[in-house]
């Protein structure tokens, strides 16, 4: 089998492996209580180029799209609106599983939140970022569903681009607001992508296509 064919056939598992290795590398540093250079650089970039009286309310607004209240409400709305209840159930179970996984990882690693600069107050542990991890899993799964089921190319790709921007913006907002390190957000994204590969494969096999 040629390398190109191997990559095409196993692309999702390659992505899972790369993201998982990246997450574990960050988690190891977090476990040893290290503040990484990327944490300092990430915050300096955001504080230098983004923080202002104009952008702070925007960051506060955007971060709500990764919060529990909004995601639960959106899940209920989608479950009601989507005719295929198996898909609706898969959206609900995705939110539940990723939330439990996030809390499990937080309690294992127990990284304190940043204290130097806070625009808003948050409780609980810092790594991996719950908003980032859950948003990547939730909106990432919606991106997958849109790609798979939406026929109109304009609607499909516009939705995918907007949701991708939203995921990144939620992650940036957590650093901006001073409640997470850069590595918290990156770690949340990486483990969530790995999780999504497994979740989508399992849901397709045991629920949607059953």
Locate predicted features.
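Transmembrane helix-loop junctions in multipass membrane proteins, especially transporters and channels
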Residues: 32-33, 83-84, 107-115, 179, ...
């Amino acid at each position: 089998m040629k390398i190109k064919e191997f990559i095409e056939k196993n692309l999702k598992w390659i992505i899972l492996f790369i993201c998982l290795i990246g997450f574990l590398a960050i988690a190891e540093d977090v476990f040893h209580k290290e503040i990484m250079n990327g944490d300092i650089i990430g915050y300096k970039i955001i504080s230098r180029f983004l923080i202002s009286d104009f952008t702070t309310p925007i960051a506060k607004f955007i971060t709500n799209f990764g919060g529990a209240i909004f995601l639960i409400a959106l899940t209920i709305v989608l479950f009601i609106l989507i005719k295929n209840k198996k898909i609706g159930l898969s959206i609900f179970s995705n939110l539940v599983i990723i939330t439990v996984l996030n809390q499990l990882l937080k309690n294992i690693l127990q990284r304190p939140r940043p204290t130097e600069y806070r625009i808003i107050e948050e409780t609980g542990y810092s790594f991996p970022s719950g908003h980032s991890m859950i948003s990547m899993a939730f909106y990432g799964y919606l991106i997958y569903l849109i790609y798979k089921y939406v026929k109109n190319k304009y609607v499909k790709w516009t939705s995918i681009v907007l949701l991708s921007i939203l995921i990144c913006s939620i992650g940036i907002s957590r650093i901006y607001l001073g409640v997470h390190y850069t590595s918290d957000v990156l770690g949340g994204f990486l483990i969530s992508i790995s999780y999504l590969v497994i979740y989508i494969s399992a849901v397709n096999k045991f629920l949607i296509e059953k």
